[in-house]
UniProtKB/Swiss-Prot annotation:
UniProt cross-references to CDD domains, sorted A to Z: HisRS-like_core, HisRS_anticodon
The protein's name: Histidine--tRNA ligase
UniProt-listed NCBIfam families: hisS (TIGR00442)
Name of encoding gene: hisS
EC id: 6.1.1.21
Length: 433
C-alpha cells in the first residue's frame, strides 16, 4: 500500500528547503536589526483563545478551524494564525510587567492550519512569519513595523510591491460606522450573498471583506469609514500618513479594506505583489493595530501592532519576479578515496576538515574515482582532496582547486593539524590567478 501526504500539505524537500532557509534567515537578520526577539508557542491552543480573539463570525472560526476534543474532553484547535497565541503567551507569562522593555518586540515562525480549498499560495498547513509589538500607542511604531516589512521584501529581492493602508478607528468610531454601514446595506439585503446576509447584523464590517462579486458591487458604493473617524482616530491616522510621507514610503489608502480578523483597530495594512504572474493571490503580508486584544485575553489594557506573512506566498512572489536565491550550501572540500584501504583515512580527513569549521563530504558508495570526481563537480566543491593507497603509504594527500585546476601535495598532518592554512593557500592562488 502506498501512502500520500494529506490534501493541502506539502513535503519541503532538499533543493526547495534551501529557499525556505534563505527567507527565514533573511527575516531573522532584519528582525534583529529592529530589536525583535523570537517567541515559540504550541501549535495547538484552547479553542477559546482563537474564538475570543479572532472572532466567532470570521471565516477562520466559523469554517476553517481544525478543532477537536482531546482525550480529556478539552476543546482545542490547531492554531490558524499567529497573533492570538502570541498574545496568550504575552498575558500568561506576564510579559507586560515593569521589568520588560516597552514596546515588547517579538517575532515568530511556524506552521498554521486552516481547513480551506487548497490552491496556489493557500494550503491547509501553511507557514507564517510574523511580528508583534506590545505596549505603545505611538503611530511611529505602526510606521516602523510597516517599514520593517518593506525592508524585508527589499532584502529578499522583491521589488514589484505596493503598500495599502486604512484606519478602522477606535471603538467609538467602529460603533458609529457600524450603524451607518447597516443603514446602507439593509436596503440591499436581498441582493447580498448568504454569508453577507448573516454577517449584516453580527459584524457588518466583514461584508466589506466579501469575495462575492455581487457583494463587491454593493460594497463599492458603501460609506467610507474614514469619514466617520473621531478626532483621536483621525489624528492617529494622519500621523501615520505624515510619517510615511516623511520617510518617502509610497502608499495607497483603501477605505474598504478591513482585514479578515476582528481584533484590529486604527491602522491596518497590506503589502501586495504587483508581479503579473501573481494574479488574484496578490496580498503577501498583512497586519495592523489591535489595542483591545491583550485585555480580551485577560491581560491589562495594552496596545499592540503586528503583521503576518505566508512563507509559501513569499516564495511564489520571488518565483514570479524571478528572484535568484544565493547558494546556501557551498561545499569547501570533497575527499576522493581510491581503494578500500583508504576508507578510514578518508573518514579521518573529512572529520578533520569539519573540525576547522569547513564543510566537507566524501564517497560512501565505493564508486570509482571518475564517479567521485563527477560528484565533487556536481556539488561545486572548492577543493578536492585525493588519497589512494600510494599516497596513504607516503603520508600525503593531493589537494586540487576546482576553479584553477592547480594541484599540490600536502602531508596528511597538514590537513589534520592546519587545514585552514592549506585552504587559504589554495584559495589565495586562485585569487592571484
Amino acid at each position: 500500500m502506498s501512502y500520500q501526504k494529506p490534501k493541502g500539505t506539502n513535503d519541503i524537500l532538499p533543493g526547495t528547503s534551501e529557499k525556505w532557509q534563505f527567507v527565514e534567515e533573511t527575516a531573522r537578520l532584519i528582525f534583529k536589526d529592529y530589536q525583535y526577539q523570537e517567541i515559540r508557542t504550541p501549535i495547538f491552543e484552547h479553542y477559546e483563545v482563537i474564538s475570543r480573539s479572532v472572532g466567532d463570525t470570521t471565516d477562520i472560526v466559523s469554517k476553517e478551524m481544525y478543532d477537536f476534543y482531546d482525550k480529556g474532553d478539552r476543546h482545542v484547535t490547531l492554531r490558524p494564525e499567529g497573533t492570538a497565541p502570541i498574545v496568550r503567551a504575552f498575558v500568561e507569562n506576564k510579559l507586560y510587567g515593569p521589568e520588560y522593555t516597552k514596546p515588547y518586540k517579538t517575532y515568530y515562525m511556524g506552521p498554521m492550519f486552516r481547513y480551506e480549498r487548497p490552491q496556489a499560495g493557500r494550503l491547509r498547513q501553511f507557514h507564517q512569519i510574523g511580528v508583534e509589538a506590545f505596549g505603545s500607542e505611538n503611530p511611529a511604531l505602526d510606521v516602523e513595523i510597516m517599514a520593517m516589512a518593506l525592508d524585508f521584501f527589499k532584502q529578499l529581492g522583491i521589488q514589484q510591491i505596493k503598500l495599502v493602508i486604512n484606519s478602522l478607528g477606535d471603538k467609538e468610531t467602529r460603533a458609529t460606522y457600524r450603524q451607518a454601514l447597516i443603514d446602507y446595506l439593509e436596503p440591499h439585503m436581498a441582493e447580498l450573498s448568504e454569508d453577507s446576509q448573516r454577517r449584516l447584523h453580527e459584524n457588518p464590517l466583514r461584508v466589506l471583506d466579501s469575495k462575492d462579486k455581487k457583494d463587491k458591487v454593493i460594497v463599492a458604493e458603501a460609506p467610507s469609514i474614514l469619514d466617520y473617524l473621531n478626532e483621536p482616530s483621525k489624528a492617529h491616522f494622519e500621523a501615520v500618513t505624515d510619517m510615511l510621507d516623511l520617510l518617502e514610503i509610497p502608499y495607497e489608502i483603501d477605505s474598504n479594506m478591513v482585514r479578515g480578523l476582528d481584533y484590529y483597530t486604527h491602522t491596518i495594512f497590506e503589502i501586495m505583489s504587483e508581479a503579473p504572474k501573481m494574479g488574484a493571490q496578490s496580498t503577501i503580508c498583512a497586519g495592523g493595530r489591535y489595542n483591545g486584544l491583550v485585555e480580551e485575553l485577560g491581560g491589562p489594557d495594552t496596545p499592540g501592532f503586528g503583521f503576518g506573512m505566508g512563507i509559501e506566498r513569499v516564495l511564489l512572489t520571488m518565483e514570479a519576479e524571478e528572484v535568484v536565491i544565493p547558494a546556501l550550501s557551498e561545499l569547501d572540500a570533497y575527499v576522493v578515496g581510491i581503494g578500500s584501504d583508504t576508507n578510514v583515512a578518508a573518514l579521518q580527513l573529512v572529520q578533520s576538515i569539519r573540525n576547522f569549521g569547513f564543510s566537507a563530504d566524501r564517497d560512501y558508495m565505493n564508486r570509482k574515482p571518475k564517479a567521485q570526481f563527477k560528484t565533487a563537480d556536481k556539488l561545486q566543491a572548492k577543493l578536492v582532496l585525493t588519497i589512494g593507497e600510494n599516497e596513504l603509504n607516503e603520508g600525503i594527500v593531493n589537494v586540487k582547486s576546482m576553479a584553477t585546476r592547480e594541484e599540490k601535495a600536502f602531508p596528511l598532518s597538514a590537513i589534520h593539524d592546519s587545514f585552514d592554512e592549506v585552504y587559504d593557500e589554495m584559495m589565495t592562488k586562485m585569487i592571484e590567478e
